Amino acid sequence: MEIRAAEISAILKEQIANFGTEAESAEVGQVLSVGDGIARVYGLDNVQAGEMVEFANGVKGMALNLESDNVGIVIFGEDRGIKEGDVVKRTQTIVDVPVGKGLLGRVVDGLGNPIDGKGDLVDVERKRAEVKAPGIIPRKSVHEPVQTGIKAIDSLIPIGRGQRELIIGDRQTGKTAVILDTILNQKAVNDKAKDDSEKLFCVYVAVGQKRSTVAQVVKVLADHGALDYTIVVAATASEPAPLQFLAPYTGCTMGEFFRDNGMHAVIFYDDLTKQAVAYRQMSLLLRRPPGREAFPGDVFYLHSRLLERAAKLNDDNGAGSLTALPVIETQANDVSAYIPTNVISITDGQIFLETDLFFKGIRPAVNVGLSVSRVGSSAQIKAMKQVAGSIKLELAQYREMAAFAQFASDLDPATQKLLARGARLTELLKQAQYSPLAVEEQVCVIYAGTRGYLDKLKTTDVVRYEASLLGALRTSGADLLESIRTGKALSKEIEQKLVKFLDDFGKKFA
């Protein structure tokens, strides 16, 4: 075979002409030390605070401490595969996560990667995990209700769309149960909705919980058909502290997608105590100076910048909303500890759950005296306002009298009546788990309580009376429920119908 010099030179010229000159440039650094989920890196001179970096083995990290001679990086994963001298690359992107409707029904980790084995995410875009909260001008005051389906909350501590309402209590007082009931209660509304702007989407963020607990929550949601409108973000106890720190921001960004596109979402952070503990661990390992209870000085800002992102937007901005229900776990009912007081001061009210009430069988164990909703009353529907107005006062008087009555032997009839009414109302506010009630059913039940229909009954019969009443309402009183649902207020005509219905029912009930 003859080799022609001209041909060789032609081939070489062609290859040189097509040679890509764009060399890949990546700013790199070297690991100085690594341990406890923190890496100290030399180099990376132009790295930004909060920027995602990549280690040689593919594990990602986030630059948090930018010091004169090194960079402190928290590692989103196992630090075992990283060693001294390894190369670290800048990605030149601030930490971002997937958002969109493709996440509904999925379980993802703190970075938004799916962990439910259902394959890759589809129909998603990417947004930064940390963004500024909306300012004052785009907002509107809270005026639409979020129905939890729990009588004690919807009547006494109403929650509005765009509100931040704290759920606070010791371990095992039913905090997650309140969240689950709220999610399940949206099913009826969402099934009837004509379009997405009428639905209420849910985002559940589990921080530092056992995997078995998260699996149980997902199973309950799936069994009740509630996963279709829910996103679960799970950073469990076995995951590194940086992922537990990031998970609430990840979930919030996912919820903001609905808020910014004229839809409504509610996000549950379960719980922020564990996020603060994870942040404390990271901060101490990064050698940031500790403050009260060894938390870093900016732990207030950690929670305030997260919760300020919940908002009700005005009509010019799409009228969407993001409601936040953070959870805080207290130790021995100590609401005056550092993190609880911080979060109470950031939120628009709190639902206080008590161990004593829980063990007395009052479940949900809501302490009506200490719980408050600072903006929710303007979101409550008129019918509920009309029937529940007196219940708070009557329960407060009952608690005051009950303490006093323990010492007094003979009580006048008025006091006895007050105590009897209070005991029946307390009984009426009890509710089984996973059985949320529609607001029109709550209105009828509470009307029966506040207008004296329970006074003739034994306290032990109240629960049975309520169950029978609800059964009767759903069968023979369906038109009455429909008129309350559509009218959203008790007109004279509807009230007369309700009184007649309760009178007739009272005669049959025995």
Curated annotation (Swiss-Prot):
Task: Give the protein's biological function.
Answer: Produces ATP from ADP in the presence of a proton gradient across the membrane. The alpha chain is a regulatory subunit.
- What family is reported? Belongs to the ATPase alpha/beta chains family.
Q: Which CDD domains match?
A: ATP-synt_F1_alpha_C, ATP-synt_F1_alpha_N, F1-ATPase_alpha_CD
Q: Which GO terms describe its cellular component?
A: plasma membrane; proton-transporting ATP synthase complex
Q: Which enzyme type, at the first EC level?
A: translocase
What the entry lists under SUPFAM superfamilies is as follows: C-terminal domain of alpha and beta subunits of F1 ATP synthase, N-terminal domain of alpha and beta subunits of F1 ATP synthase, P-loop containing nucleoside triphosphate hydrolases
PROSITE patterns tied to this protein: ATPASE_ALPHA_BETA (PS00152)
Residues of the site described as Required for activity: S371
Q: What is its EC number?
A: 7.1.2.2
Q: What is this protein called?
A: ATP synthase subunit alpha
Annotated ATP binding lies at: G169, D170, R171, Q172, T173, G174, K175, T176
* Quaternary context: F-type ATPases have 2 components, CF(1) - the catalytic core - and CF(0) - the membrane proton channel. CF(1) has five subunits: alpha(3), beta(3), gamma(1), delta(1), epsilon(1). CF(0) has four main subunits: a(1), b(1), b'(1) and c(9-12).
Reaction(s) this enzyme catalyzes, per UniProt: ATP + H2O + 4 H(+)(in) = ADP + phosphate + 5 H(+)(out)
Q: Which UniProt keywords apply?
A: ATP synthesis, ATP-binding, Cell inner membrane, Cell membrane, CF(1), Hydrogen ion transport, Ion transport, Membrane, Nucleotide-binding, Translocase, Transport
GO terms for biological process, alphabetical:
ATP biosynthetic process
Q: How does it sit in the membrane?
A: Peripheral membrane protein
User: What Gene Ontology molecular-function terms does this entry list?
Assistant: ADP binding; ATP binding; proton-transporting ATP synthase activity, rotational mechanism
